[in-house]
């Protein structure tokens, strides 16, 4: 398989970092092809008789990623360790973290030369730590690499205990400009509750979603959500994010009352039922899927071209994950009758106002630098990790590199970017009360 240029660069940079540090994390947005990149990295570094462990946190991803891996590396055998199968024979073993972290499975685990963690912002969780510690007990020289779109966790905990460097970061804006993701067409819609949402209490991980439900889950607001959706995206496959299960059910019911084929997915939805619903969404039997936070990760349905946010996001990473579900491009061979030029984002929760752009960092160089040897890096003053030179935020501890590039950034914005012409946001005042522009 031929990698895209940015994928090849990311794989090369990760390999260089592994030679130096024995660990690294790669930051790449939804749609960048993380599974392809991790597969290519394994293939690049694989040696005869090596054992590689690939860890996923969702059941449906284990076999999906193993199949993609085999297309990239047909000469490296794979096997599965999950709730229904325990096969340790493969040269590359794909496993679900919940299964592998159980004591009896840890006891049967073989020695590994490399561990790859998908959605690696979860790597400091207790279940992952049990696995990593056992792997290191068996082989202290094991290489550990992580791939994630959102390294900055909502709870602000750093990843330093697992990764001491970020070898490469791919930005959403870059992939949109190069045609590998579609651009978001974003509408921030005021339904008269903006001030109330801004005053919602924060918890450790997010806003208090019970309070959000009391503000947002009203028949009049739900009707407005459907009306605006019909006006701006009524012919599009859509994923809706709500605050609670009750909120999601009420929004789903409102869609159905409007004769829209809609289903709900929650954390309690059985795995097979969820797979069927998402299959039906992708293939046109369902138009809208309403969920709480189930579809923020590990969900791949390229025909989805509308994202509706009926809740605020206290952390930028959550917003990026949600909107990212709609930015994938279409493979004409898989979906020959689907045309997708952009993704409509309807933000009723004012997340866009809070967080702005989807990119976590800004490239102050203004043009792609010529690569020769190792990618340029800088040292984070907070945790001493190596991170890409262009990063505005440390992927390991969350430190913001604000002051160093402020003057250059202001010059860049003022001279190179017409924010009025290029802004993806549009305000809509539904109540003519002057609270929107």
Description of each model-found segment:
Residues 1-27:
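Conserved pre-motif I regulatory segment
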Residues 20-41, 241, 265:
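Walker A/P-loop
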Residues 36-37, 46-71, 245-246:
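Conserved Walker A/P-loop ATP-binding site and its immediately adjacent core
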Residues 63, 79-88, 249-256, 260-296:
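Conserved helicase ATPase core of P-loop NTP-dependent helicases/translocases
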Residues 83-114, 125, 129-130:
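Conserved helix/coil segment N-terminal to the catalytic DExD/H
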Residues 98, 267-362, 367:
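Conserved RecA-like P-loop NTPase helicase motor core
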Residues 121-186:
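Post-DEXD/H (motif II) to motif III coupling segment of the RecA-like Helicase ATP-binding lobe
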Residues 166-239:
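Conserved interdomain linker/interface between the two RecA-like ATPase lobes of SF2 helicase motors
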């Amino acid at each position: 398989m031929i990698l895209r240029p940015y994928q090849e660069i990311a794989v090369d940079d990760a390999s260089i970092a592994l030679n130096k540090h024995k660990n690294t994390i790669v930051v790449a947005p939804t749609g960048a092809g993380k599974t392809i990149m991790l597969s290519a990295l394994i293939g690049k570094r694989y040696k005869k008789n090596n054992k590689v462990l690939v860890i996923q946190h969702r059941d449906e991803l284990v076999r999906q990623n193993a199949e993609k891996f085999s297309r990239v590396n047909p000469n490296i055998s794979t096997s599965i360790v999950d709730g229904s199968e325990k096969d340790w024979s493969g040269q590359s073993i794909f496993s679900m973290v919940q299964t592998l972290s159980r004591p009896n499975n840890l006891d049967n685990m073989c020695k590994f030369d490399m561990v790859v963690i998908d959605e690696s912002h979860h790597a400091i969780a207790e279940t992952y730590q049990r696995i990593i510690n056992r792997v290191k007990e068996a082989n202290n020289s094991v290489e550990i690499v992580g791939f994630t779109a959102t390294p900055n966790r909502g709870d602000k905990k750093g990843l330093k205990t697992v990764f001491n460097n970020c070898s490469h970061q791919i930005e959403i804006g870059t992939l949109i400009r190069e045609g590998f993701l579609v651009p978001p067409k974003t509408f921030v819609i005021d339904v008269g509750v903006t001030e109330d949402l801004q005053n919602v209490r924060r918890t450790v991980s997010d806003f208090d979603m019970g309070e959000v439900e009391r503000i947002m889950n009203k028949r009049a607001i739900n009707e407005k959500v459907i009306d605006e959706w019909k006006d701006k995206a009524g012919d599009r496959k859509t994923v809706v994010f709500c605050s609670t299960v009750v909120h999601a059910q009420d929004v789903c019911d409102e869609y159905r009352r409007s004769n829209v084929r809609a289903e709900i997915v929650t954390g309690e939805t059985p795995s097979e039922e969820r797979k069927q619903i998402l299959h039906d969404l992708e293939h046109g039997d369902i138009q809208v899927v309403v969920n709480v936070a189930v579809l923020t990760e590990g969900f791949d349905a390229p025909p989805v071209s509308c994202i509706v946010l009926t809740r605020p996001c206290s952390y930028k990473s959550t917003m990026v994950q949600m909107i990212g579900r709609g930015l994938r491009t279409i493979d004409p061979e898989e979906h020959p009758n689907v045309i997708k030029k952009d993704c409509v984002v309807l933000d009723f929760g004012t997340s866009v106002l809070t967080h702005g752009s989807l990119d976590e960092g800004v490239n102050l160089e203004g043009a792609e630098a010529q690569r020769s040897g190792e990618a340029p890096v800088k040292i984070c003053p907070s945790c001493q990790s190596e991170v890409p030179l262009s990063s505005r935020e440390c992927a390991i501890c969350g430190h913001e590199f604000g002051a160093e590039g402020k003057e250059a950034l202001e010059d860049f914005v003022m001279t190179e970017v017409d924010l009025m012409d290029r802004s993806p946001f549009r305000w809509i005042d539904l109540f003519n009360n002057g609270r929107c522009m």
